[in-house]
């Protein structure tokens, strides 16, 4: 029975690495997965999912207006798809998360989503909010703070390494802009 999974974490926990390993596992069994990633995240090239350890794969892009159910149904008509893998799923809209539930429930294809739970202000992303609500399985991937505790928050920094306390929810960046920390160090960095 197909299910929808949400693998979430702070940055640098290996979400993309885990996604790429899952894709490889399906391919190794002669099955056909399809990978999607957010069009707005082009840090490693357009239409690519890349991990910090050097793994990479081609991906279909989703934009704010992409109907994922229609896209996946069309791909599945051409060639049976055994799994849908979605990177940067925090950027999905409520409607797109619903469309992915339809992929699971009507097309009977498992959907594995990988993304951040919260932004640099500790607020849920829209996609993450509805994945937390509607996914069949929730899996937290763990990373560590500089103090050794579990990191579950993300700090956005300026060019001098100072924590930023306001701004747009989405600002694409990697280790140069974001630091994963525990809640205590998050509060200290923001002066809370």
Curated annotation (Swiss-Prot):
Its EC number is 2.7.1.21. ATP binds at residues 9-16, 87-90. The keyword Cell membrane does not apply. Gene3D superfamilies: 3.30.60.20, P-loop containing nucleotide triphosphate hydrolases. GO terms for cellular component: cytosol. It catalyses: thymidine + ATP = dTMP + ADP + H(+). Keywords: ATP-binding, Cytoplasm, DNA synthesis, Kinase, Metal-binding, Nucleotide-binding, Transferase, Zinc. GO terms for molecular function: ATP binding; thymidine kinase activity; zinc ion binding. The active site is at residue 88. It is found in: Cytoplasm. Zn(2+) binds at residues 145, 147, 182, 185. InterPro entries: P-loop_NTPase, Thymidine_kinase, Thymidine_kinase_CS. Pfam families: TK (PF00265). Disulfide bonds: none annotated. GO terms for biological process: DNA biosynthetic process; thymidine metabolic process. Homotetramer. Belongs to the thymidine kinase family. PANTHER family: THYMIDINE KINASE, THYMIDINE KINASE, CYTOSOLIC. This is Thymidine kinase. It comes from Vibrio vulnificus (strain YJ016).
